């Protein structure tokens, strides 16, 4: 097989997008699981936690060699997924022909399935904002306030989150980013399986339902994080 031709073909690019998409979905599960530790501060868990569970979990992840290695693959996965997505979108636009032909071909599709490139761009901009707010000061500049648990000193990332989400504009931008992610996943989740060879209507419908459920759980949790901190449901005080 000519691998160079395969990975530059439309089918090959879509397979690469599907595989990197699966990898990024697994990251979302890990990321939302870690960040959900902030909710341990809620009154029905431990209102005196003050971010302790989240900070200790974040410290463990940041100190793990395996996790740091995975971050490299994560960034590569994002870059490859984004580049391949734009290339496929440009090629598809060239193949669609006239606007009349596009209208005929898109009558049965959802608006978000036709807007994956736009949604992907919004997610990319959201990702830049998110990384600059938390990952850079935590991993690169080390400008976060310290906090000590037992004999272990770590970054007070919980306080940084709270401080960041006191700005209503940032909260709105984060919610927009999460909504963009939701619509991107609504189409991308089952489409990735279809690209990998699942064409049975019964299984595709099942995967669509699974994808919708997965997306709602992940994105509702992500959206609740800035909202709950802005409304002081979760706080370091």
Where are these regions (language model features)?
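Membrane-embedded alpha-helical bundles that constitute the cytochrome b-like, heme-associated redox core
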Residues: 1-237
């Amino acid at each position: 097989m000519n691998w160079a031709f395969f990975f530059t073909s439309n089918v090959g690019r879509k397979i690469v997008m599907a595989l990197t998409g699966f990898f990024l979905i697994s990251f979302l599960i890990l990321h939302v699981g870690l960040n959900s530790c902030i909710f341990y501060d809620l009154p029905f868990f431990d209102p005196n936690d003050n971010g302790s569970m989240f900070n200790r979990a974040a410290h463990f992840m940041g100190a793990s060699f395996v996790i740091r290695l995975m971050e490299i693959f994560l960034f590569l996965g994002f870059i490859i997924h984004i580049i391949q997505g734009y290339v496929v979108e440009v090629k598809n636009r060239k193949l669609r022909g006239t606007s009349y032909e596009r209208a005929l071909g898109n009558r049965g599709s959802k608006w978000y399935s036709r807007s994956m490139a736009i949604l992907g761009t919004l997610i990319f901009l959201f990702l830049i904002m998110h990384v600059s707010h938390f990952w850079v000061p935590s991993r690169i500049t080390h400008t976060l306030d310290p906090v000590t648990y037992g004999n272990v000193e770590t970054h007070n990332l919980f306080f940084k989150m709270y401080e960041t989400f006191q700005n209503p504009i940032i909260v709105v931008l984060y919610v927009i980013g999460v909504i963009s992610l939701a619509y991107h996943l609504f189409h991308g989740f089952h489409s990735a399986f279809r690209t990998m060879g699942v064409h049975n209507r019964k299984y595709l419908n099942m995967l669509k339902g699974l994808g919708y459920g997965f997306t709602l759980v992940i994105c509702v949790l992500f959206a609740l994080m800035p909202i709950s901190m802005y409304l002081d449901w979760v706080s370091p005080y």
